[in-house]
């Protein structure tokens, strides 16, 4: 597209895309119980899905029970996922600087890229400590692997603006 041939437009589009994805990813942590109420019948034990992926279905059942019982007995546990969402939104807002002045705020983009890379060792260390199955850890790591792509492309375009 002609519009994205301008490096400044490309940088802004990539960063806004990243910011929206980051914010939506975080916001999905708030209605966790509601989301699991929808997922369990579709993908939990007894669903058609469970015939092909029984381990994932069993995990969905376990997470559903954990959230339902945990939030039921200790509703303050949900406060942790509320803060997780807040953290995602706060980090997304930090990218307003690079959207406005990409060259001056290149460091924010590079910081975001570092965080995307750090998702992988963080997951590999803490996932097993918390009993998280490997397939779920792959999902968690994918956020860093996917998130780094628009940031890397934005960084390349910012460097084009500098030169």
Model regions and ranges:
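N-terminal membrane topogenic signal
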Residues: 3-16, 157-160
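N-terminal signal-anchor transmembrane alpha helix
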Residues: 9-50
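Membrane-interface interhelical connector segments
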Residues: 39-70
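Individual transmembrane alpha-helix segments
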Residues: 64-92
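Short, amphipathic, aromatic/basic-enriched membrane-interface segments that mark the entry/exit
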Residues: 77-82, 105-111
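Juxtamembrane helix-break-helix junctions at the cytosolic face
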Residues: 90-106
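Alpha-helical transmembrane segments of multi-pass integral membrane proteins
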Residues: 109-163
């Amino acid at each position: 597209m002609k519009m994205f041939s301008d490096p400044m437009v490309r940088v802004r589009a990539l960063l806004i895309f990243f910011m929206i994805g980051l914010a939506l990813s975080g916001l999905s942590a708030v209605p966790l119980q509601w989301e699991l109420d929808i997922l369990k019948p579709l993908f939990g034990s007894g669903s058609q899905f469970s015939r092909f992926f029984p381990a994932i279905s069993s995990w969905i059942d376990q997470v559903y029970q954990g959230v339902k019982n945990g939030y039921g007995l200790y509703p303050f546990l949900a406060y942790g996922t509320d803060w997780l969402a807040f953290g995602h939104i706060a980090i997304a807002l930090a990218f307003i600087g690079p959207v406005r002045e990409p060259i001056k705020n290149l460091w924010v983009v590079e910081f975001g890229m570092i965080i995307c890379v750090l998702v992988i060792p963080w997951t590999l260390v803490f996932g097993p400590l918390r009993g998280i199955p490997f397939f779920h850890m792959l999902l968690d790591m994918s956020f860093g692997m996917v998130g780094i792509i628009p940031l890397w492309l934005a960084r390349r375009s910012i460097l084009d603006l500098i030169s």
